[in-house]
């Protein structure tokens, strides 16, 4: 009997946690596969009332485990539950301690281990060491040790799945002896809402320097006659100098965030580097045009990539000048997103994970 386990740091609806696109993607893929095989999603939580519980969401079993102070301690916590379930396949996305759990599942249970990349830098060597070196020598040492474990685990994966051509190229270069496949992000179809009467631009993301929230503030100053909405949390010092036409919401429930995205005229993404941000795809499925400073979206007819702030400003000005342009482009983007990130992506993930396709 096939029994599938999906590993994720947090449930995407966990209000006590710091949620990323990886958490949402693992959840979406686990929900899809639960329609075909017994599927278990293992997540950690800071909500003590949920720790130890198994809650069924549709056909998906969600296991809530204790969230330890140090990430490396997730390895024994998650591995213990995996050994109890005895899965035939373990899926994990992004570079974390859970990558090690996936590899140990293969070693101890002979489970198939599939690893999926998130951002491009996740394929690099010693990612955690570079990140933690800014926070002191002790944390850098632990980061180095965790990085070594993760790298060993990545090399032991049965299959590596990339989400775009750039990632596939990096993965093929690093894991030249492995099979590399590409599956784009999987999306549910969100509810749609009527556009705001006034031209409105939205930005959604973490308030980190690599997300460049300051650029969105500069855009708001460039278009004082328009409304600018910002949803996210993190270092609010980065957006201290925001103008009066920019409204900051902080952290919102996902449903409320999607409502704002759907009602806005344009979504702007200013991140330095990402895979395929979920928020971009969600905007497309809501019928909201997207302009991205650095991120490319492959497989669709419309080019969301700007590459230069002057180009972004020019294209934004053109869209904000006409509600009809926004609505027409939004409908075209929605059709493309439905085809690529709902229909084709669904079939791709089923081919990758369900037997007999996953014979490596």
Annotate each language-model stretch with its function:
Residues 5-7, 193-211, 217-221, 229:
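Conserved donor-binding/catalytic core segment of Leloir-type glycosyltransferases
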Residues 280, 289-292:
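Short hydrophobic beta-strand element within catalytic cores of glycosyltransferases
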């Amino acid at each position: 009997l096939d029994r599938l386990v999906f590993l994720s740091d947090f449930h995407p609806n966990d209000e006590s946690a710091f949620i990323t696109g990886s958490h949402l993607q693992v959840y979406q893929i686990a929900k899809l596969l639960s329609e075909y095989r017994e599927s278990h999603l293992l997540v950690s939580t800071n909500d003590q009332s949920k720790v130890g519980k198994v809650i069924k969401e549709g056909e998906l079993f969600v296991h809530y485990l204790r969230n330890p102070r140090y990430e490396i301690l997730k390895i024994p916590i998650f591995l213990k539950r995996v050994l109890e379930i005895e899965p035939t396949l373990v899926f994990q996305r992004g570079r974390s301690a859970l990558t090690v759990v996936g590899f140990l599942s293969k070693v101890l249970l002979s489970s198939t281990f599939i690893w999926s990349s998130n951002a491009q830098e996740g394929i690099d060597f010693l990612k955690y060491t570079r990140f933690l070196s800014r926070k002191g020598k002790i944390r850098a040492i632990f980061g180095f040790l965790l990085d070594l474990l993760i790298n060993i685990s990545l090399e032991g994966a049965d299959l590596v799945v990339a989400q775009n051509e750039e990632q596939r190229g990096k993965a093929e270069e690093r894991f030249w002896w492995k099979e590399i496949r590409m599956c784009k992000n999987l999306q549910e179809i969100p509810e749609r809402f009527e556009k705001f009467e006034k031209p409105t631009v939205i930005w959604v993301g973490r308030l980190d320097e690599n997300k460049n929230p300051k650029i969105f503030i500069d855009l708001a100053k460039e278009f004082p006659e328009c409304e600018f909405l910002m949803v996210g949390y993190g270092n609010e010092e980065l957006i201290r100098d925001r103008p009066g036409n920019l409204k900051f919401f902080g952290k919102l429930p996902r449903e409320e965030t999607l409502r704002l995205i759907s009602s806005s005229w344009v979504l702007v993404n200013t991140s330095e580097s990402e895979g395929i941000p979920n928020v971009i795809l969600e905007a497309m499925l809501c019928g909201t045009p997207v302009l991205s400073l650095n991120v490319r979206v492959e497989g669709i007819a419309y080019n969301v990539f700007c590459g230069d702030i002057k180009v972004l400003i020019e294209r934004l000005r053109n869209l904000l000048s006409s509600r009809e342009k926004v609505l027409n482009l939004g409908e075209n983007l929605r059709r493309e997103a439905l085809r690529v990130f709902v229909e084709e992506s669904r079939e791709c993930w089923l081919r990758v994970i369900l037997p007999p396709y996953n014979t490596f």
